[in-house]
C-alpha cells in the first residue's frame, strides 16, 4: 500500500503564522514521518508547494509597479528555506504553481475533462478607472451574512462564508476604491452537478473521514451543487487552454488542487521514474491524507473529488482530510497588521523549533477552536517535555551507566508490574498508530505522554537506585523494562520532535534512521551498549513570560530586515 501525504499549499502573499503551520504543513510533516516509520520511506510521498497565482499578488504587483513573478520568486524561496531548513519539514517535493510541470499538467487535465466544462456569459464588476474586470479579491465590500465591512469578493474573513463579488454590499475596487459597474463577459464553468451522488456515496461510506469534513461536504451536496467558474479575467495565473478563452486565467483554487497531482509527477520526473507517480494516485492501491484548515474543506471534499472523478482515470479519492479548526492567539485571531500572533520566521528566534513543534501539536485544534497562550506553552515545555520525558530519559540512561556499566541488564523472573509496562508499550504503539491514521495527531501525542508518566510512576514505585543495593535482579528488571519504554516513547515522538528524538536514540546507542515503528514493540537486547546521559530539554526561564514583550519586539525588528519585499 502506498501513502500520499499532502499539505494545503501556503499562499505566498504573507509569511505563514503558527495557525497556518499547524493546520497544514506541520501536521502533514508529523504524519509523513510517522508513515515512513510504519510503512517504509519508499512507500510514502509527501508533497506541497507555494500557491502564488491569483488576485492578491496581482493587486500587490500593480500597487508596487512590478511584475507578480518578481514578488513571488523571492517569497517562494523565503518560505521554502523556512520550511526545509528551519522547521525541518521533510517534504519529498515542495514546488510552486509557477512550475512548468504544474502549468502544463493543469492545462492538459482541464482539456481532458472538457465535457464537464461549459461557457456562459455573465455580468461582473468592472472598474472604469483601472479599466479591468474585478474578480474575487479585486472587490471588497460588506458581507451580506455577517455585516463584516472588509469582506473580499471570494470569502468573508470573519464568518468564513464563500462569496462572489455580486453578493457584496457596497462593493469597491480593491485597487482604487471606486465603486464598480457591471459589464458582460464570458467565462468557463466546471459543472459539479453530475458528481453530487458519487460524492455523497463516497463521503457517507468512508470509515476514516472526520465528522467536520463529512458535515461540510454533505451540506454542500444537500444544498445542490452548481457549476463553478473555472476562469478569471486577471492576467497572473495559468492561461486558460480553451478555444476562445484568450486573456483568461484558471481560477487559483482549481489549479492549486491539481497541484497535488503535478507535484507527485514532478517528484518522480526528478528521480527519472516518471511513470511511478501513478502508483501514488491509483484507486485501491493508495491511502491519501490531506492536511488543511477547516475553511478549505469544500475545495478538498467537493471540488477535488469531482475533478478526480471527471478525469475518468481511476484516481484515488482522499482517504482522510484532516481539517483543523482555528488556532487563536491569546483569545484573538491572528492579525499581522495589529501584531497579534507569532509568525513562522519569528518563532525559531524565541525558542527551539522542536519545542514549537511539540507544543503546537499539543494545541492542535482537532475537535474545536483552540487558544494558544504563553502560560500553557511554557507549561507544556517545562512540565511535559522537560519533566515527563526529559527527566525520565536522563534518569534511566544515568542508572544504566552507573549500575550496569552502560549495558542493558539481563532480565530474570519479570514480575507482573514489569510485564504490565512492557505490554503497555506495545498497546501504546498500536493506539498511537490508530490515532495518527485518523488524523488525530494531538490525541496520539497525548497517549505517548501517558506512557511517559506511567513509566515515571513505575520507576518511582520500583526505585532501582535503592533496590540495586539489596535486590540487583529487581533493579535489572526495572531498568531493562524502562529502557525499552523510553525507546518506544522516543520513536513515537520522533514525528513530532525529530531532532530531540534523535538525541534520545543516540543516548540509547541506537540509530533512528534504521528504525521501524513496530520494532519498538520488542525490548532492547540485554548487553546492548547505551550512550552517555545528557540533558535533552531545557526549561524556559522563570522570567520568560515577564520578558516576553521585550523578546518579541527584538525578534520582530530582526525578522523585518530579513523578509523579502512582498512579505514586509
UniProtKB/Swiss-Prot annotation:
InterPro entries: Anticodon_Met, Met-tRNA_ligase_1, Met-tRNA_synth, Methionyl/Leucyl_tRNA_Synth, MetRS_core, MetRS_Zn, Rossmann-like_a/b/a_fold, tRNAsynth_Ia_anticodon-bd. Pfam families: Anticodon_3, tRNA-synt_1g. A motif ('KMSKS' region) lies at residues 333-337. Binds 1 zinc ion per subunit. It catalyses: tRNA(Met) + L-methionine + ATP = L-methionyl-tRNA(Met) + AMP + diphosphate. Its cofactor is Zn(2+). Signal peptide: none annotated. It comes from the Archaea. GO terms for cellular component: aminoacyl-tRNA synthetase multienzyme complex; cytosol. ATP binds at residue 336. Keywords: Aminoacyl-tRNA synthetase, ATP-binding, Cytoplasm, Ligase, Metal-binding, Nucleotide-binding, Protein biosynthesis, Zinc. It is found in: Cytoplasm. One of its GO terms (biological process) is methionyl-tRNA aminoacylation. A motif ('HIGH' region) lies at residues 10-20. Its main location: cytoplasm. One of its GO terms (molecular function) is metal ion binding. PANTHER family: METHIONINE--TRNA LIGASE (PTHR45765), METHIONINE--TRNA LIGASE, CYTOPLASMIC (PTHR45765:SF1). Belongs to the class-I aminoacyl-tRNA synthetase family. MetG type 1 subfamily. This is Methionine--tRNA ligase. The gene is metG.
